């Protein structure tokens, strides 16, 4: 990144995105923070995101948008619960109070509103606030990226795609960060199963910027969803030098790489990626994305019959402190995978019980509202599967399978729960469940022809003489 390109007060104003501060230094550091967020990369020459935020708040302690981006990025990281983190709760409260006492632009007030909504678990309302900004300010990258992340957590694939479609024509290739609009739009296309267009748009982004880790990520998804394992392996190897510098997405891209090996039944190769990259980066970053990837990878391997118990125990040291966070159901379900895999019954029980308590009195928090009818029964199904009660797992998951999108994440990420349902049905001693497994596999084969993983499961079903 080129510090000389970061905008001062006048440059922000010239772009129609005035910031309520007189500090040019604060404005430039705001731009530096935003650029690193958009590019999935902590630039150590700038001090990384944390360093830029710290310097920005020193340059102007009363800069509302500086506090908004700081709180917003911590919140969308989903690693801190407002219920449990008094410092974060205080930061959000001070942001709202500071905004109330200043003369801000309507755009800035909407940003504060979006952060406050997200902090309180009102994710849909947060996205509405960011979309309101984009009606008048379609080149507000912070609103674009926060809405993109918000829709992702909500599992709202079509709004995630359309949010970018609405603003893209307002940008030109000469505007900094333009390629990242291509990559975000391509991901929305992929998640709405427009695979050809998604690949085309993502590769346009990569042509402009080979270090666009999110564009590479979209192509990885396309190959996964088409069951193009060899193409996926070749693509990841050929682009690794570009995206491995994006520390906030690199581990996730290695996770995608490993999925191709799991699909092919090459488990040792998958474990090598886990040990050399996924787990190493997870321990270094402590990020939720890196953690849930590691959880998911081990769970998939375990369902394939691979012994990963020792790795579960190591991973539990990362996930256990977040057992009672309950920020996202998606995170909770993945942390439960590791607690169960490590045979930590007390941790597993505590996670499910505390989630149940929140589900009984969810208030305005959307995730807690969804917990009662979605998150808790999914957790109970995982516990039942772990205890060998496969029939119960089927009965819990079967009514929910078309609602899995509600936990957020991508189709590729949520497929672990579809796989869990298939394995549960195959292992159940009830013939109707085994017949249901056959139907599920027919569905999988129709949606992703030539999937080696599906073929292995079909062979297992054939052995049952269903």
List each model region and its residues.
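C-terminal non-catalytic interaction modules
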Residues: 377, 385-466
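TPR alpha-solenoid repeat register
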Residues: 66, 109, 142-143, 177, ...
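Single-residue signature of alpha-solenoid repeat helices
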Residues: 45-49, 88, 126, 160, ...
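Solenoid-like repeat scaffolds
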Residues: 54-60, 96-102, 131-138, 166-175, ...
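Inter-helical turn/loop elements of alpha-helical hairpins
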Residues: 22, 27, 35-54, 58-105, ...
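A conserved active-site cap/scaffold subdomain adjacent to cofactor or substrate pockets
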Residues: 249, 254-320, 332-335, 340-341
